[in-house]
Amino acid sequence: MKEVTAVVRPNKMSVTKDALDKIGYRRMTAIPVLGKGKQRGISGELNFYIQPKLLAKRYSTGMKYIPKRLLSIVVNDEDVDQVIKTIIGVNQTAQIGDGKIFVESIDEVIRIRTGEKGELALK
């Protein structure tokens, strides 16, 4: 099993969720996060108003953190490539700020309610 963690634009979360749902991955964890990278705070991505004087200041000093969504999905090994392709397919704009995907091995999954382990806990 693998954990696929993606950091995506907030405005892409709905289409990402729908695309993953279409390939059978309805279970996921999504968390609003703040981060920074090469993008350095493109204001067009923000969902709230920024006062013009603060916007002017941002261009001179750079915004420290911008809103993103962190999406975590535990998948079977054979589904990792399909999940990654799906996430890239709906999030790739060829612009700085499209996000990142991380893949890590998961040793065990246990459903708390039933005690089921492994692939049974993912169903």
From Swiss-Prot:
SMART domains in alphabetical order: P-II
Gene3D superfamilies: 3.30.70.120
Disulfide bonds: none
Keyword Magnesium assigned: no
Family under the similarity heading: Belongs to the P(II) protein family.
Job description of the protein: Could be involved in the regulation of nitrogen fixation.
Stated name of the protein: Nitrogen fixation nifHD1 region GlnB-like protein 2
Organism, scientific name: Methanosarcina barkeri
